[in-house]
Every structure is written in structure tokens, then in C-alpha cells.
Amino acid sequence: MTVNEIDLPPIFCPLESARHPRAHLVDERAREWIRTSPMCTTDEERTWVAASCSTDFFARFAPDAATDDRLLWTSLWVYWGFAFDDHRCDNGPFSNRPAAFSALAGRVQRALEAPSARDESDGFIPALQEIAAQFRSFGTPLQVRRFAAAHRAWLSGVTWQIGNAAAGRMPGLDEYVAMRLLSAGGEPPFAMLELATGLEVPAQDLERPAVRALTEMAIMVAALDNDRHSLRKELARGQTDQNVYSVLMQETGLPLQEAVAAATRLRDRVLLRFMAVHDRVRPGAGLELSTYLQGLRYGIRGNAEWGLRVPRYLSLGRVPDPMDEAPLEWAESPADDDRSAPRGLPTVAWWWDDALLGV
């Protein structure tokens, strides 16, 4: 099936849309930082990094960011993350060498956590350290540690993914879902919600099973949406190694179009469960937790809006196109309104545990 033949259904997402009112001004500062950042070595790289429109992305996650500086530096991590993903994870010299990537990931993570660490071997490392220094300047120690843990989780998932690719191994759907919760990079942006708003969620709230389930479900919905967003570009480039569609095709024998339909049904069932658990948890939440839960909602919707327009996914040429500002079409109802846990996915079946609703 060719790129033009695949039919991607509209996204079901009846959640609130919002964007920080000063996102455009903040992005001007972000792009100036990119122009001088050591993570980019050519003008073409800088152009494609800017084409991720990462301030627009995170301004939709945190439309209530407390200050422009908080939005700037959290958005700059998103710019950094997409660039690192493109040049060190999905492509480049580490993309099929798990041992080499694991060593790089260890150095990157230590540089994030230790302000005294020095490593000039890769331009991404000093760029990340500059961002981390700003996080420490305005975040609480706990917020910074939570972000570091989320960052480590992401790198572990990417290592898992690269290991599969190097071995020519296609995971089953249950394993893929477990891996994608990490490798999709959803943990760091949601951990940055606290850094952006300045509100620290008490540990007894953030670590509650229902809240952890909501965080994981938000990550999974966004991850499956990103598989959708990137499908046409991956088909055009022949890079369909590990996404939800290739996994379903391998496991079930479905053709691509039917795999798209099956993945859409799974995604919508997760979103419906997210909404049900959210509506039980939110009424009793204090300010900090309520703000975080709203951030999860903003993040799901914002990721969908951004992904449907961003040149990172839509541009197939060597030069990115402008941001697509055309009106978006949304599905009016879910592709599957079954409220039970999907079969064959024990790794996430606990999201449907009735105990989560006993808040």
C-alpha cells in the first residue's frame, strides 16, 4: 500500500484545547537558542529542529505556564528531545547499535543529573546541561528529580527499541505497548508540567495508582496518535520497523488498512478509560493534583492538534513546509466504545481495575 492509498480516520478527542497566549513570542527566543546550540551542526539540521515547532507543542500541554521562562526552557527540552530522537535514536550511527546507544544514553543521563559532569564528545550533552541548569534554577528539587526519572525511563525505552531493531525482532503487541510507554518519550513532557506551572503535586497524590494509571494512559494515547501522525512519513522513507501497525500486521496477519482500524479502536478504548478514571479522581483533587490532571488532558489534545499540523510529520521533502493551519477534522464518536479491558494486553490490564474507581 502506498502513502497516498492509506486512509487515516479522524481522531476522537473530546478534550479541551488551549495554548499559552505568549507561545509565539517565547518561540522566537527558542529559535534563537537553537541557532547557537551545539546540538546542531548544519543549517539543514537547524531548519528541521525548528520544524518540530516544539514551543507550539508544549504551549498546548502547559497553557497555564507560570512564566515565559518556564515555558521557554520546557519547550527547549522538547526541541532537544525531538532532535535527539531524530539524530541519535531513529537515525544516525546509534540507531542500530544498542551497546553504543546504551553507553551514550548513560552519559546523557549522568550529564542531566550531575551539574558538574563534563562531556563534550556529543553536542547534545552540553545543550541538555544548559536546559537542566535552568530547570534547577526555577524548579524544586523534587520536580527536577521527577523529571530526571522520567528522562531515564525514556532512554531505557529507546534502548529497548534499538535492541529490537538491531536483532531484527518485531515485538508482540503486549510487549510493544510496554516498550512504547517508555520509548515514545511521553514521560518527560508530562513530568515537565510541574516545572512549567510551578505547582508540585504531593507524592501521596502523584503516586496513587489511579493517578499513575492516568499518566500512563495519557502517554499511551499520545504515543498511538504519534504512530498515526508519523505513518505516512515512515511509509515514504521505508522506516516502518516498529510501530503499532507493523506490530499488529506481524501478530495478527492483518493488512495495513485493517491494522490502522484495529489500532484506532485500541487507542479510543484507552482514551475512554482515561476519561472515566479522570472523572472519578478529579472532583476530590487539590489544586496541585487538579492542575496536573488538567495538564494530562491538555497534553492528549495538544499532542493531537500539533501532530496533525507539524512539518515534522507532514513534510516529505528535504526542506520542511510551513506549519499547516487548516481547520482540523475530528471524529464525533469513538471507533470502539467497549469499556472493558482489551484482551491480550496484560501489561496494561490494570488500567481497567475497578479499584481505581474507588476514589
UniProtKB/Swiss-Prot annotation:
GO terms for molecular function: metal ion binding; terpene synthase activity. Keywords: Lyase, Magnesium, Metal-binding. A motif (DDXXXD motif) lies at residues 85-90. SUPFAM superfamilies: Terpenoid synthases. Pfam families: Terpene_syn_C_2 (PF19086). It catalyses: (2E,6E,10E)-geranylgeranyl diphosphate = (-)-spiroviolene + diphosphate. Mg(2+) 2 binds at D90. A motif (NXXXSXXXE motif) lies at residues 226-234. Substrate binds at R180, K233, R312, Y313. Binds 3 Mg(2+) ions per subunit. InterPro entries: Isoprenoid_synthase_dom_sf, Terpene_cyclase-like_2. Mg(2+) 3 binds at N226, S230, E234. Its EC number is 4.2.3.158. Mg(2+) 1 binds at D85, D90. Its cofactor is Mg(2+). Belongs to the terpene synthase family. The Asp-Asp-Xaa-Xaa-Xaa-Asp (DDXXXD) and Asn-Xaa-Xaa-Xaa-Ser-Xaa-Xaa-Xaa-Glu (NSE) motifs are important for the catalytic activity, presumably through binding to Mg(2+). Catalyzes the formation of (3R,6R,10S,11R,14R)-spiroviolene from geranylgeranyl diphosphate (GGPP) via a 1,11-cyclization and a 10Re,14Si-cyclization. This is Spiroviolene synthase. It comes from Streptomyces violens. The lineage of its organism: Bacteria, Bacillati, Actinomycetota, Actinomycetes, Kitasatosporales.
